[in-house]
């Protein structure tokens, strides 16, 4: 019986693999680089030189133009792909057993055909020739199957092939019935020859059936071989008629040679183990392939002793003298049995005694008696013709009757043996059917195992894919964190810049306040001067020079009035500009509402907006730099203003000196006061108007102070916004830490699941080991022939194996479903969380962008206001300088001043 396949578990997929969601496993894709790997596998030494010199052997066609060591694919020296000839010394390590088996089977078939044609040349044996040809073809097929048994399962043969031995046995029984000898026949010699041929043919057919019933069972069951050997011994030892009638030698008729075409290496082990008698040992020696070939060549072929031109027939024995000597030595004890005429009664008594001897003793003594009876005609032929013995008819009839009885007994024995063979063949067919059923179950189990392995591979691929996705997500999160940190750094820089600009604005505002205080001081000094002038006017009423001073004061006051009118116009223009800006801001607010409505559309263009945001940030930074430069310019201009103020103080001192000179002039102008008495009333009116203008300018200063306070409030609001953004950043960091904790928990769960899978695989391996042990037990039990009593145990073992396999399959399926469900949920949750966090971050970025744009606009407005104030101050200073440079006695024209010329007295 053929042995079932070993159920080996393929556990190499997971051994040594450590799964982690963050670390991406190295890719197994082969790179296109050629030089390093090929140089590492480059053959070197004498073997490389010898292989390079053999241009015709093992030469692979290169893919490029020429075959060089770099372009040739490196292979080991003793690879299976290289077909080494049998004569080379390298073939010692790799024997080509398949080709030897095929050639051996072909030789066996051919030699058997030659032998059968040489022995059975009569037309009555054509059927045997036909059957032998079929058997040789079957043997070739069986040998091919046995040669490829390492690649196929042992029970892949169809049931129709297993039923063929039973059909052959039935056909052989039919031929035995047809070829059984009749009781009465006209010619006794023909009758004996027919009986001998039929007995030999039947024995050979039965032996052929036994040997070819299951060709693969020879190497696994010693009991079947022993049984077939015993049957062959019975047929060969009891074949008396054939030995008497045929002219062959006793050495040739001692045992019929039955050729088994599927004789492999297992036959030698079986024949060495079957050591029953000397005949079995001789058969073991004769069953080798070389001994068979030598025997057949001795029987069929011709020998050329000296030359190859004239063949000489080989005689088995040239001289017959040794037979004469043996017969003379053997006949010293029983001389009377040679001739039935001298001592007929003794021969009869000896025959009767021999009939009563036990079967074992007769089997031992038959060979010597047969040799004597077979040698007798040759001895008589060699002696003189007058000395030939004459046999009586009674003796011949008696011998014939004995032979017929023996033939009948042998036929009964053959029928009994054939019945036993039928029983055994039925049992074999039943066992083969059982084995086929078991094989189908094994195939189903293997298919289930393959499916499980495929499912495991799919699960591993899914796990690796999920790990890669997790790694990519972690990388994306890290990239986003880096961007957030960059934005934080930019925000901190912008905050510092805002603080610096705010400080600079405060300094500028303080400087403006100082300038305003200085202006107030100057105005107070002017008022003091006017008071002093009034005092001087009260004291010097008579002088006409005092009128001139009053005229100069009137001209200065008219200039100041003109300046205040210009300031009022500027303030009105600024008011209109503020109104226009408020309208524009309202429109922008409406635009912002529309933008909020279109926020969903803008989410699709997040990537573009991020790039635009980066560009805008760069532009904002550039604008901030430009603004800082402008602020620096303002500072320089401020310094210039300070220098100008110093100059003005010096000019004030000079003006004081000039006042003393004016006092001197007042004494001279006392005479002209009478002319200007009428103009005093007009001057008083003008002074009132100027006071009203001063009040308006004070109100404008208060409005400017309110604006400055509003700017300070906006700066505070910006600081609050920055603090809120910092809190949001802290929240994002906490969310990231929570996500890291979730990922670590997932990794732990992954490790636990991997451990569970490994445990399940160990359980599967244990079940497979139990299954293999059960199969081995089944094989051993079937080899012993105890199928009837142990089928229940086999079925129980199969049930246990099937139940264990079903449990493992169900458990693996449950684990796979749980893994898939958990990972799908986690993946969806993580993706949703990441999306929400990214949306929040993007919204925050948009809000920060808008707030920064607003802050920049407000700062630009503040800078414009500061520039306007600076320009106004510069105008005032220039006008003051221009007024101081002119002659104080010079009067303003009425067209420019808009004041009526006073009437003189």
Curated annotation (Swiss-Prot):
Residues 99-113 have a biased composition (Basic and acidic residues). It is a peripheral membrane protein. Residues 400-810, 844-882 form a coiled coil. Gene3D superfamilies: 1.10.287.1490. It is found in: Cytoplasm; Membrane. It comes from the Eukaryota. Belongs to the ATG23 family. This is Autophagy-related protein 23.
């Amino acid at each position: 019986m053929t042995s079932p396949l070993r159920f080996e578990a393929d556990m190499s997929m997971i051994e040594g693999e450590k799964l982690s969601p963050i670390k991406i496993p190295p890719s197994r894709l082969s790179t296109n680089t050629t030089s390093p790997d090929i140089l590492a596998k480059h053959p070197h030494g004498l073997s490389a030189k010898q292989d390079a010199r053999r241009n015709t052997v093992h030469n692979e066609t290169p893919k490029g133009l020429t075959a060089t060591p770099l372009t040739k694919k490196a292979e080991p020296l003793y690879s299976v792909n290289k077909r080494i000839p049998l004569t080379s010394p390298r073939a010692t390590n790799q024997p080509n057993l398949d080709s030897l088996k095929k050639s051996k089977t072909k030789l066996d078939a051919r030699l058997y055909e030659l032998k059968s044609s040489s022995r059975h040349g009569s037309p009555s044996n054509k059927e045997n020739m036909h059957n032998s040809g079929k058997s040789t073809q079957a043997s070739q097929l069986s040998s091919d199957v046995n040669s490829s048994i390492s690649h196929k399962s042992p029970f892949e043969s169809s049931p129709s092939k297993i039923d063929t031995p039973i059909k052959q046995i039935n056909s052989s029984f039919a031929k035995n019935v047809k070829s059984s000898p009749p009781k009465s026949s006209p010619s006794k010699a023909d009758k004996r020859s027919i009986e001998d041929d039929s007995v030999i043919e039947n024995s050979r057919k039965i032996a052929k059936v036994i040997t070819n019933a299951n060709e693969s069972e020879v190497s696994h069951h010693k009991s079947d071989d022993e049984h077939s050997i015993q049957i062959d011994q019975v047929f060969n030892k009891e074949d008396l008629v054939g030995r008497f009638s045929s002219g062959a030698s006793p050495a040739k008729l001692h045992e019929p040679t039955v050729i088994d075409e599927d004789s492999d290496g297992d036959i030698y082990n079986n024949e060495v183990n079957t050591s029953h008698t000397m005949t079995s040992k001789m058969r073991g020696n004769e069953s080798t392939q070389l001994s068979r070939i030598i025997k057949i060549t001795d029987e069929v072929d011709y020998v050329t002793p000296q030359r190859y031109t004239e063949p000489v027939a080989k005689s088995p024995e040239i001289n017959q003298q040794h037979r004469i000597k043996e017969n003379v030595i053997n006949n010293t004890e029983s001389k009377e049995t040679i001739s039935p005429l001298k001592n007929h009664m003794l021969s009869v008594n000896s025959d009767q005694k021999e009939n009563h001897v036990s079967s074992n003793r007769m089997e031992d003594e038959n060979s010597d008696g047969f040799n004597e009876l077979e040698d007798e005609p040759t001895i008589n032929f060699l002696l003189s013709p007058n000395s030939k013995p004459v046999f009586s008819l009674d003796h011949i009839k008696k011998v014939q009757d004995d032979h017929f009885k023996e033939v009948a007994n042998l036929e009964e024995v053959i029928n009994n043996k054939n019945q036993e063979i039928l029983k055994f063949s039925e049992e074999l067919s039943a066992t083969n059917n059982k084995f086929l059923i078991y094989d189908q179950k094994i195939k189903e189990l293997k298919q289930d195992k393959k499916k499980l392995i495929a499912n495991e591979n799919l699960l591993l691929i899914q796990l690796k894919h999920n790990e890669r996705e997790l790694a990519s997500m972690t990388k994306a999160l890290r990239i986003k964190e880096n961007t957030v940190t960059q934005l934080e750094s930019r925000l901190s820089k912008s905050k510092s810049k805002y603080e610096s600009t705010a400080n600079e604005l405060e300094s500028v505002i303080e400087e403006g306040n100082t300038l305003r205080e200085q202006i107030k001081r100057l105005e107070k000094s002017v008022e003091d001067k006017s008071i002093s002038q009034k005092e001087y006017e009260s004291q010097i009423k008579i002088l006409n020079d005092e009128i001139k001073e009053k005229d100069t004061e009137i001209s200065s006051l008219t200039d100041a009035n003109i300046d205040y009118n210009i300031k009022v116009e500027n303030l009105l223009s600024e008011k209109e500009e503020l109104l226009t800006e408020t309208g524009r801001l309202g429109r922008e607010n409406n635009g912002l509402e529309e933008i909020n409505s279109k926020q969903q559309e803008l989410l699709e263009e997040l990537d573009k907006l991020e790039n635009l945001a980066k560009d805008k940030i760069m532009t904002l930074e550039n604008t901030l730099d430009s603004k800082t430069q402008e602020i620096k310019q303002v500072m320089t201009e401020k310094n210039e203003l300070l220098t100008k103020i110093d100059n003005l103080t010096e000019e004030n001192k000079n003006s004081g000196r000039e006042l003393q000179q004016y006092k001197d002039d007042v004494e001279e102008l006392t005479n002209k006061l009478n002319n200007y008495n009428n103009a005093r009333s007009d001057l008083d009116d003008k002074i009132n108007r100027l006071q009203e203008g001063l009040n308006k300018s004070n109100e404008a200063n208060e409005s400017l102070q309110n604006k400055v306070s509003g700017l300070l409030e906006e700066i505070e609001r910006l600081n609050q916004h920055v603090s809120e953004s910092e809190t949001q950043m802290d929240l994002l960091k906490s969310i990231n830490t929570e996500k890291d904790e979730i990922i670590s928990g997932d990794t732990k769960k992954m490790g636990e699941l991997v451990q569970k899978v490994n445990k399940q695989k160990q359980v599967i391996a244990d079940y497979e080991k139990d299954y293999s042990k059960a199969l081995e037990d089944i094989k051993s039990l079937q080899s012993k022939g105890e199928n009837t009593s142990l089928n229940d145990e086999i079925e129980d073992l199969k049930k246990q194996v099937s139940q264990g396999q079903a449990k493992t399959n169900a458990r693996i399926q449950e684990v796979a479903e749980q893994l898939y469900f958990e990972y799908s949920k986690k993946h969806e949750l993580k993706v949703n969380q990441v999306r929400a966090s990214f949306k929040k971050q993007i919204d925050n970025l948009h809000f920060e962008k808008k707030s920064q744009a607003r802050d920049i606009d407000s700062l630009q407005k503040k800078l414009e206001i500061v520039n306007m104030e600076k320009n106004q101050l510069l105008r005032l200073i220039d006008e003051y300088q221009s007024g101081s440079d002119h002659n104080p006695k010079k009067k303003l024209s009425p067209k420019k001043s808009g004041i009526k010329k006073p009437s003189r007295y």
